[in-house]
């Protein structure tokens, strides 16, 4: 895939991209912020072999990824949920 990603990627393209790259930028609408956001993530939790997940929930494509820049919660968790992402780079 080239550097100029189309505005809306297909689910299989997103899944292949995140699995093939060490890090990526993922863009999606975040209900928490009521806006479109872009986050830097990785498909595998650092220093482990624990991988992210993809599921269809209530008809939506949901990707669970490790947010590299997120503030960890009290358990050290930085997994985040991207619903219907529009692109990854």
For each predicted feature, which ranges?
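Acidic, metal-coordinating catalytic cores used for nucleic-acid/nucleotide bond scission
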Residues: 32
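A short, Trp-centered hydrophobic/proline-enriched beta-strand micro-motif
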Residues: 20-29
């Amino acid at each position: 895939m080239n550097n100029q990603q189309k505005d809306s990627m297909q689910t299989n393209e997103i899944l292949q991209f995140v699995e093939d790259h060490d890090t990526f930028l993922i863009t999606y609408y975040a209900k928490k912020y009521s806006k479109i956001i872009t986050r830097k993530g990785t498909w595998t939790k650092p220093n482990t072999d624990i991988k992210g997940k993809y599921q269809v929930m209530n008809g939506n494509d949901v990707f669970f990824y490790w947010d590299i820049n997120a503030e960890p919660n009290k358990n050290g968790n930085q997994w985040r949920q991207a619903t219907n992402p529009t692109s990854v780079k």
